[in-house]
């Protein structure tokens, strides 16, 4: 009798599943628990799935399951860092499992079926398109202006390792995104030759202008480019590309039959952008003037 009582108390202490529960797991980890009644339409007769509630559940589940793919990149030493396959909820396969549970009996458990999402740029492609240098351009700036230098580094990082596929159009504003304080950009107003220049995100146009000249050197098709209303000190006259979120953009198209890899890096007071592709690319390079190595004196307007 005592043994039976102890056994009963032991069973009561164990966690039990609700009679109609569905436990959804991902890689063995529980991510959702629901019941049949949560999705049953209030109609007499044979139970039916409330599709509106099911769709809402699937949307929430997909957000939990989703893992973004990561492209392969080149590190600062030129070595390939492999990418990562992402995945999302395989909705058709999950629906079949869910309906089997819904019209069945008792509790059930579903390990979410995942659908792989492969990165656009894998190690093999990156190795293929990083062999032939198409165009390079170097501009210079005053590295003692910390805020402006920071903005240059930040925007250069945004376009570094970006791959432009054949017939694809690159948009500077779209790739770099909005330049805000929340994203780390700083106010960098300076005075050059007595005129106030730049504000939050100051320095971005030097990156876009450096990119324009590298792109032009590589013989790529310029789709959209605007010059500043006045000359800028870091490129020859007429060789700049002003950009502004919600305003002017710099865009170019890859008309070649091979992808183009952008490498962008700030080294001290130099901004260097180099374009690479496959060694089988049939490119037509252009001659362009070099940037001035001496820049005019500037005054930090915040001081």
From Swiss-Prot:
Coiled coil: none annotated. This is Uncharacterized protein YoaR.
